[in-house]
């Protein structure tokens, strides 16, 4: 006596990947804002200010040498 089994799989898994392409997509996005806050702006101090300054000086001196 043979036993019957039924398996359901999504149709998408049967489509070969090269034949699957998306020409256009539409995404709906909604959000609920429950709170807001205000932050004061302050000065931004780079972490490696001295290194940045040295690199800037080197670049300037290299440019002045090549412009001669």
From Swiss-Prot:
It comes from the Archaea. Pfam families: DUF2589. This is Uncharacterized protein AF_0415.
